[in-house]
């Protein structure tokens, strides 16, 4: 599949009908299974309470049917922190056959543009710190940072995605109007400081999770403890770097991140 053609033929827009919300739920089932799917009623609530429901539609599929096929979506909930509105982006999903085509990034960029138009300068979401591909996307491609770690955020689930491990999560903060984010989105990031601290995750962790739960649990606990120690000292995760056999999270004092002036972290 040609990447540039996909970029041209994928339309990103707001979803606003029950049928489109049902399509989002169908994508959840296809990608993650039915056990952890969010029902369509939550999409309705998000739409009517200041959240976002965004869809990615394949225009090429309309040639074979009466309407474009949804191939991805983003669901965000409206929230406030210290009296200021922000968005909690609960999930972004893209069909596997459309991975590595820029669809997820386009959804996030549309989400950012829409939020800024509404006077919102912060979007947060949680992600698995052991998911290294997602970490690269969040920090390197989008310019998010993280300074909060939630152990077992959603509880242990039966989903094969979690391999029976606690659902530990990092909280990504995406400061939409910051110079850091603007520079990274323009492919002009500031170099990481040589003094950055590191939290290492084995490159083959996905395989370990599926074959050796005891080792995976031990590694998860080690990663959790390191993040909690650095965050307690006022550090933030702001990048990732791959090397043979491992990927390193890069952490620096939150007050010194180039192009970003962070408010005090508010615990929720």
Task: List where the protein language model places each region.
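Intrinsically disordered, low-complexity, positively biased terminal segments
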Residues: 1-5, 118-120, 136-142, 146-268
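A conserved beta-strand-loop-helix scaffold within acyl/acetyltransferase catalytic domains
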Residues: 11-95, 238-243, 254-255
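A conserved beta-turn-beta hairpin within the catalytic core of GNAT-like acetyltransferases
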Residues: 79-89, 99, 121, 194-198
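Active-site acidic-Proline motif in GNAT/NAT acetyltransferases
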Residues: 95-97, 127
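Conserved acetyl-CoA pyrophosphate-binding loop and the N-cap/start of the following alpha-helix
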Residues: 98, 102-110
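Aromatic/hydrophobic pocket-lining residues that form π-stacking "cages" and hydrophobic walls in ligand
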Residues: 111, 135
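Conserved GNAT acetyl-CoA-binding A-motif
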Residues: 115-128
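Extracytoplasmic beta-strand-rich oligomerization domains located immediately C-terminal to a leader/signal peptide
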Residues: 129-130, 147
């Amino acid at each position: 599949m040609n990447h540039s053609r996909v970029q041209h033929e994928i339309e990103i827009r707001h979803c606003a009908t029950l049928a489109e919300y049902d399509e989002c739920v169908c994508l959840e089932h296809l990608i993650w299974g039915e056990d952890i799917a969010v029902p369509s009623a939550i999409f309705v609530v998000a739409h009517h309470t200041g959240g976002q429901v965004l869809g990615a539609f394949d225009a090429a599929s309309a040639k074979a049917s009466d309407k474009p096929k949804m191939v991805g979506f983003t669901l965000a909930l409206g929230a406030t922190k210290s009296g200021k509105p922000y968005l909690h982006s609960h999930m972004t999903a893209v069909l596997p056959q459309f991975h590595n085509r820029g669809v997820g990034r386009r959804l996030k960029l549309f989400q950012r543009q829409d939020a800024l138009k509404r006077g919102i300068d912060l979007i947060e979401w949680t992600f698995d710190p052991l998911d290294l591909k997602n970490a690269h996307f969040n920090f390197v491609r989008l310019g998010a940072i993280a300074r909060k770690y939630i152990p077992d955020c959603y509880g242990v689930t039966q989903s094969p995605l979690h391999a029976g491990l606690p659902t530990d999560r990092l909280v990504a903060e995406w400061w939409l109007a910051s110079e850091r984010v603007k520079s990274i989105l323009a492919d002009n990031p500031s170099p990481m400081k040589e003094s950055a601290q590191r939290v290492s995750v084995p490159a083959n962790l996905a395989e370990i999770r599926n074959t050796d739960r005891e080792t995976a649990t031990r590694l998860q606990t080690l990663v959790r403890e390191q993040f909690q120690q650095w965050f307690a000292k006022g550090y933030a995760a702001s990048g990732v770097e791959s090397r043979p056999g491992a990927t390193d999270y890069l952490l620096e004092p939150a007050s010194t991140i180039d192009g970003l002036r962070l408010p005090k972290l508010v615990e929720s």
